[in-house]
């Protein structure tokens, strides 16, 4: 039998934003024994000595005092550097475009932080993610958040059954607008705070400037597949497949896009047209493939839908396992700007089945020059 809410301890991962604030408020109102914990993953003191983490923690303290729950801060900077940031740099070095949010959820929020919560006697860890868990069928299923525009299952695709069984997403069945309303009605300190955007450790800083502090940039030629030089690039790591902005190629006709990379020769390939054939593919290989519940791939093959980037529409695919955590994903048609390093995430209707990392990209049986 399930424990009563008042006998159930829930640790809420609080970021200082409105979503996690409302998650904590709702759980408290439902009678749970709630503890708010702020995670510090990155020392983001800027040149002027200003640290957004300090400001965020102050917001967490204000909200927890308003709700009437205890709060703590916990530091995971070392784990974050080793598991997330190092991975981020390694992927860029390899010419790929990583997704640090996926790795942060897998290694920090729902591993290191979850373990910490359980060590405090917590029954569950709750976060302000827009996703849902369905416990009705014996196994736990992860479902998309009801607010389609805010659904965050894409970033949670690596969570396994063990993690999902200990997780709560209190705002997953709410629209973002309703979350703001609840915060305003309760007069929470974060009710009007704007949402954070971009990669957490870069914040509002310029991406190129930030990355160049850690990886030396190697400028090189920008050219067409026919070998016509169109200019210079600042370093392959700054460009992603399908990118239009920042190429600096003038002239008439359709806009120019990054369509390929040659890491050995340090060449960025460019061509014109949003629907340029060079931007389309029909198959990928994926690594680090994991599933949200056991038995999904017992047959070794499955037809489902997939997303290749956040907020993209779903595409019909066939997934074939080629190793323990490796798969071949064949598209039903062609998809634009599928990018190595990004997440491929699998769905069956509302359910998120799991996902992996896009490795090689193919078209008509030929591997594309995407890294």
Curated annotation (Swiss-Prot):
Pfam families in alphabetical order: tRNA_Me_trans, tRNA_Me_trans_C, tRNA_Me_trans_M
Binding positions for ATP per the UniProt entry: 13-20, 39, 128
Entry keyword set: ATP-binding, Cytoplasm, Disulfide bond, Nucleotide-binding, RNA-binding, Transferase, tRNA processing, tRNA-binding
Gene3D superfamilies: Adenine nucleotide alpha hydrolases-like domains (2.30.30.280), HUPs (3.40.50.620), Translation factors (2.40.30.10)
Annotated GO biological process: tRNA wobble position uridine thiolation
Molecular functions (GO terms): ATP binding; tRNA binding; tRNA-uridine 2-sulfurtransferase activity
Residue ranges, annotated region (Interaction with tRNA): 150-152, 309-310
A GO-annotated cellular component: cytoplasm
Compartments (UniProt record): Cytoplasm
Active site: 104, 200
Family: Belongs to the MnmA/TRMU family.
Alphabetized NCBIfam families for the sequence: PRK00143.1, trmU
Name used for this protein in its record: tRNA-specific 2-thiouridylase MnmA
Species of provenance: Bacillus velezensis (strain DSM 23117 / BGSC 10A6 / LMG 26770 / FZB42) (Bacillus amyloliquefaciens subsp. plantarum)
Taxonomy of the source species: Bacteria, Bacillati, Bacillota, Bacilli, Bacillales
């Amino acid at each position: 039998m399930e424990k009563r809410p008042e006998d159930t301890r829930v640790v809420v991962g609080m970021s200082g934003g409105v979503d996690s604030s409302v998650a904590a408020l709702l759980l408290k109102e439902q009678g749970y024994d709630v503890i708010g914990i702020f995670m510090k993953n990155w020392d983001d003191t800027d040149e002027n000595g200003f640290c957004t983490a300090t400001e965020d923690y102050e917001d967490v303290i204000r909200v927890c005092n308003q709700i009437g729950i205890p709060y703590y801060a916990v530091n995971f900077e070392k784990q974050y550097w080793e598991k997330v940031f190092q991975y981020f740099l390694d992927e860029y070095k390899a010419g790929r475009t990583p997704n640090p949010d996926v790795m942060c959820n897998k290694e920090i929020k729902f591993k290191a932080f979850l373990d910490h919560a359980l060590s405090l006697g917590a029954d569950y860890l709750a976060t302000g993610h827009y996703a849902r868990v369905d416990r009705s069928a014996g196994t736990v299923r992860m479902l998309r958040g009801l607010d389609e525009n805010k659904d965050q299952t894409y970033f949670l695709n690596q969570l396994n059954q063990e993690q999902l069984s200990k997780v709560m997403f209190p705002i997953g069945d709410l629209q973002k607008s309703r979350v703001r309303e609840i915060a305003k009605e309760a007069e929470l300190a974060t009710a009007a705070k704007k949402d954070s955007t971009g990669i957490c450790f870069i914040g509002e800083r310029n991406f190129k400037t930030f990355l160049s502090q850690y990886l030396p940039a190697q400028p090189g030629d920008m050219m067409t597949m026919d070998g016509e030089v169109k200019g210079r690039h600042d370093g392959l790591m700054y460009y992603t497949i399908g990118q239009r902005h920042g190429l600096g190629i003038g002239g008439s006709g359709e806009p120019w896009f990054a369509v390929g990379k040659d890491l050995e020769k340090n060449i960025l390939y460019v061509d014109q047209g949003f629907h340029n054939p060079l931007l389309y593919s029909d198959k990928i290989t994926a690594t680090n493939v994991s599933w949200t519940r056991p038995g999904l791939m017992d047959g070794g093959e499955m037809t489902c839908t997939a997303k290749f980037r956040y907020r993209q529409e779903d595409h019909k695919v066939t997934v074939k396992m080629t190793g323990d955590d490796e798969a071949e994903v064949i598209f039903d048609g062609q998809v634009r700007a599928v990018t190595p390093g990004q997440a491929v995430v699998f769905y069956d209707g509302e359910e998120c089945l799991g996902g992996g990392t896009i490795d090689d990209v193919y078209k008509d049986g030929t591997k594309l020059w995407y890294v």
